[in-house]
Amino acid sequence: MASQLQNRLRSALALVTGAGSGIGRAVSVRLAGEGATVAACDLDRAAAQETVRLLGGPGSKEGPPRGNHAAFQADVSEARAARCLLEQVQACFSRPPSVVVSCAGITQDEFLLHMSEDDWDKVIAVNLKGTFLVTQAAAQALVSNGCRGSIINISSIVGKVGNVGQTNYAASKAGVIGLTQTAARELGRHGIRCNSVLPGFIATPMTQKVPQKVVDKITEMIPMGHLGDPEDVADVVAFLASEDSGYITGTSVEVTGGLFM
């Protein structure tokens, strides 16, 4: 079984945004571990390069045998940057990515009564607009090349149930769910599957800013009794990226340990 997983994505080229840390890095490691070539993208180029180093490159003794991963830098909230990212990936690997995972995301928390328009706009721009731009550019590349693919967008359970102090984040992640379902309806005839993943409270750099007393309270609400790890999300992404999920599209998979059932 282990050897099968190591080769499950052996022919895949995977573009992962937000690959410099947290869920994005864990997804990159998991996909590479299953044989995929990874194009790791982050706003922080050095962080993306560090992820690629962890994957192992040509001639490296670490990582999967195929190796040839590459790092890219892009601000996915800008249309031109998103288009250029896909062009750069295609130029580097001579084909469009068959797996696209949008993990890039930010928070700017504040209560609704005090939230600034700027904080609203920043979160919507990265989390929702950025996911739209990458999804659109990837779909255009796949369709124009006559290729099948799997697009996986990282949403959040907060997009389904809301959360105090996160009106902008909740709205952005709810939008990702709707975007992904609509994309699935439109792109299915092209052989492109689109699914979203809804993490719960996952131990990442983003959640490390949460006060410990809040973490303890949330942990008490999780039936599984503990926070999730980025690898828990990566496990689901790898399944959705593979042909093991070949008849699954338009779905939203919750990775929450049972939080907010």
Swiss-Prot record:
GO terms of biological process kind: androgen metabolic process; estrogen biosynthetic process; fatty acid biosynthetic process; protein heterotetramerization
Alphabetized UniProt keyword annotations: Fatty acid biosynthesis, Fatty acid metabolism, Lipid biosynthesis, Lipid metabolism, Mitochondrion, NAD, Oxidoreductase, Phosphoprotein, Steroid biosynthesis
Biochemical pathway: Steroid biosynthesis; estrogen biosynthesis; Lipid metabolism; fatty acid biosynthesis; Lipid metabolism; mitochondrial fatty acid beta-oxidation
Gene name of this polypeptide: HSD17B8
Predominant location category: mitochondrion
Residues carrying Phosphoserine: 60
Name this polypeptide is given: (3R)-3-hydroxyacyl-CoA dehydrogenase
Reactions listed under catalytic activity: a (3R)-3-hydroxyacyl-CoA + NAD(+) = a 3-oxoacyl-CoA + NADH + H(+); 17beta-estradiol + NAD(+) = estrone + NADH + H(+); testosterone + NAD(+) = androst-4-ene-3,17-dione + NADH + H(+); 17beta-hydroxy-5alpha-androstan-3-one + NAD(+) = 5alpha-androstan-3,17-dione + NADH + H(+)
PROSITE patterns assigned to the protein according to its UniProt record, in alphabetical order: ADH_SHORT
Role this protein plays: Required for the solubility and assembly of the heterotetramer 3-ketoacyl-[acyl carrier protein] (ACP) reductase functional complex (KAR or KAR1) that forms part of the mitochondrial fatty acid synthase (mtFAS). Alpha-subunit of the KAR complex that acts as a scaffold protein required for the stability of carbonyl reductase type-4 (CBR4, beta-subunit of the KAR complex) and for its 3-ketoacyl-ACP reductase activity, thereby participating in mitochondrial fatty acid biosynthesis.
Pfam families noted in UniProt: adh_short_C2 (PF13561)
EC number(s) recorded for this UniProt protein: 1.1.1.n12, 1.1.1.62, 1.1.1.239
Subunit structure: Heterotetramer with CBR4; contains two molecules of HSD17B8 and CBR4.
N6-succinyllysine found at: 160, 173
Annotated GO MF terms: (3R)-hydroxyacyl-CoA dehydrogenase (NAD+) activity; estradiol 17-beta-dehydrogenase [NAD(P)+] activity; NADH binding; quinone binding; testosterone dehydrogenase (NAD+) activity
InterPro entries given in the database record: NAD(P)-bd_dom_sf (IPR036291), Sc_DH/Rdtase_CS (IPR020904), SDR_fam (IPR002347)
Tissue: Widely expressed, particularly abundant in prostate, placenta and kidney. Expressed at protein level in various tissues like brain, cerebellum, heart, lung, kidney, ovary, testis, adrenals and prostate.
The species this protein was found in: Homo sapiens (Human)
